[in-house]
Amino acid sequence: MELIKEIKNLKRNKNAIILGHNYMEYGVQLVSDFTGDSYDLAVKAMKTNADIIVFAGVYFMAEQAAALNPDKKVLSPDPNAGCSLSDSLDVDTLKKYKEMYPNAPVVLYINTSIYTKALADYIVTSSTAIKVVKSLDADTIIFGPDANLANYVERKTGKRLVKVPPNGRCIVHANYTRQLVELARKKYPNAILMAHPESPLEILEASDFVGSTNQMIKFAKESPYKEFIVATELGMINALKLQVPEKTFYPLVTTEAYACARCPYMAMITLEKIKRSLEEEIYEVKVPKDIAERAKEAFERTMRLLNN
């Protein structure tokens, strides 16, 4: 495909890399130098020698990369690519909860803005949340913005999580129901169900495996099973097919609900936008120095805890 060749040439000429989230469309994953979940890509961003980082993901991910790499030029192919979770929590709301629970550590899911991250003690992903919460010497923890993930972490750790906001949800995972699971199991009787922790608790309880996008890939590679129903954003099927081509994957959707399984924000990142952003070096992500330093501090504190 000519467009893919052009993007690869631009990367080479500009010493640029593309970081692609696992939810990206197939073509975007093909041009990405690294694919992974939010945490994985944040770490990759810190280790790169490239001059330019194009973040093929939603805006909060590009913000994080910019905060962690103040000397790099970080580009977002579409700065309007938001996130329902990130949009659900603002700085003023988080400050109020911190005042209400002054002794509670603040653990924020990575799907939030850099400005709220700057108020956090720890920044987690779905793959690290349980370990971080379990490690903290506190029985009450402020956790946001994903209430579904909070419910799952509470179940696994026995700790009280004060959800901020109380009803933060991913618009894709919020659509999953037990009825969808039952229909999928009937349609694909030889498949096992993998679910993302952003899903409602009833879906997680009905699943054979619960994990982040990277954990799903690892599980699919190592599992003796050949067929999988995947309860997460539709683009994940692309990542699984690319990395585990010998196995078969089915999205947890009906024909009628197919569009609802695609995150409208992730879908905004296209090859055409990546090419334009890189070619013209537009939509550079800028984070105020003090905000970036505080967010980076929380991220590095989390990494130290995870590496212990």
Swiss-Prot record:
Binds 1 [4Fe-4S] cluster per subunit. Pathway: Cofactor biosynthesis; NAD(+) biosynthesis; quinolinate from iminoaspartate: step 1/1. It catalyses: iminosuccinate + dihydroxyacetone phosphate = quinolinate + phosphate + 2 H2O + H(+). Keywords: 4Fe-4S, Cytoplasm, Iron, Iron-sulfur, Metal-binding, Pyridine nucleotide biosynthesis, Transferase. Pfam families: NadA (PF02445). Its EC number is 2.5.1.72. Belongs to the quinolinate synthase family. Type 2 subfamily. This is Quinolinate synthase. The gene is nadA.
